[in-house]
Amino acid sequence: MNFKSLDWGLFLILVAALAGQASLTMAGPKQPLLLPVIRQTSSIDCGLAALAMLLRDKASITTSVAALVNLAAVLVDPTTARHRREGYSVSELQTLAGAFAYSLQARNLTLEAFYKRSFPLIAWIDPGNGGHFTLVEEVTATSVALADPTRGRLAIPSNTWRELWLQKTTGIVLELE
């Protein structure tokens, strides 16, 4: 190997990979690299798991549910900390994203506007248990691909997605900016 002609960025990646600190994975244009689903660790931290995946996938920030729980203990006002009983609110997730110098924008979208968004994004769905945050990875004409903190990676038929996501005529998404 001729090190004089080797690109320095590639060289550093190669050194890190050889040292076991990174992995080199080549994905073709039709085969996106699917990163592992970050699972929720309790019944109330789906929002934290979805935020951890969104930070990783959109901003290359690696964090964990446990780290976000610890961060919330510092940043979230304990007098309004409903998350200990009911899970994290949109406002609390926005506060946590702000700690990483990112803005988490909540939007009410029609189904048509949802299909035009840039993915991944967090969606709030109601599977009948009072609400749940999940990461939407990709949308096609027939299905919605999720990295779900509870159930793992799955594809939901479009008609089922409409029932889970739409609250009358709009649904809620959270986008990292």
Protein language model regions, located:
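N-terminal Sec-pathway targeting helices
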Residues: M1-F11
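Residue-level recognition of hydrophobic positions within alpha-helical transmembrane segments
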Residues: F3-K4, A17, T41
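Conserved active-site-adjacent core of cysteine acyl-enzyme catalytic domains
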Residues: G20-I38, S43, A52-D57, T62, ...
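Bacterial N-terminal signal peptides
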Residues: G9-A19
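Active-site-proximal loop/helix segment associated with metal-binding centers of metalloenzymes
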Residues: C46
